[in-house]
């Protein structure tokens, strides 16, 4: 399930660190988080869709690795991002 381009652009605009920023860890993690949320909702309805579940696990792993990278590079940006996204209760 692809993310709607308008929604993706809105997320990019919201989390970008500068004009034209699409590759910063903050933007990538925010986009992944939205895709993870959408797939989680899909799996609540379609419990036996194991192909999607496997894709979801890949996205969760990718987000976890990016969060680890951001934590090692700049702990303040990491803390601000997890606060904004509502991760890590």
From Swiss-Prot:
Record keywords: Ribonucleoprotein, Ribosomal protein, RNA-binding, rRNA-binding
GO biological process: translation
GO CC annotations, alphabetized: cytosolic small ribosomal subunit
Function summary: One of the primary rRNA binding proteins, it binds directly to 16S rRNA where it helps nucleate assembly of the platform of the 30S subunit by binding and bridging several RNA helices of the 16S rRNA. Forms an intersubunit bridge (bridge B4) with the 23S rRNA of the 50S subunit in the ribosome.
SUPFAM superfamilies referenced in this protein's UniProt entry, alphabetically: S15/NS1 RNA-binding domain
CDD domains noted in UniProt: Ribosomal_S15p_S13e
Lineage of source species: Bacteria, Bacillati, Actinomycetota, Actinomycetes, Micrococcales
Record flagged with keyword rRNA-binding: yes
Descriptive protein name: Small ribosomal subunit protein uS15
Protein source organism: Micrococcus luteus (strain ATCC 4698 / DSM 20030 / JCM 1464 / CCM 169 / CCUG 5858 / IAM 1056 / NBRC 3333 / NCIMB 9278 / NCTC 2665 / VKM Ac-2230) (Micrococcus lysodeikticus)
Assembly with partners or alone: Part of the 30S ribosomal subunit. Forms a bridge to the 50S subunit in the 70S ribosome, contacting the 23S rRNA.
Family that this chain belongs to: Belongs to the universal ribosomal protein uS15 family.
NCBIfam families, per database record: S15_bact
GO molecular function: rRNA binding; structural constituent of ribosome
């Amino acid at each position: 399930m692809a993310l709607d381009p308008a929604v993706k652009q809105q997320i990019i605009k919201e989390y970008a660190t500068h004009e034209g920023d699409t590759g910063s860890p903050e933007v990538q993690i925010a986009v992944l988080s939205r895709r993870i949320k959408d797939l989680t909702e899909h799996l609540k309805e379609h419990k036996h869709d194991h192909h999607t579940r496997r894709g979801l696990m890949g996205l969760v792993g990718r987000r976890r690795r990016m969060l680890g990278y951001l934590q090692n590079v700049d702990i303040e940006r990491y803390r601000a991002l997890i606060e904004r996204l509502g991760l890590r209760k």
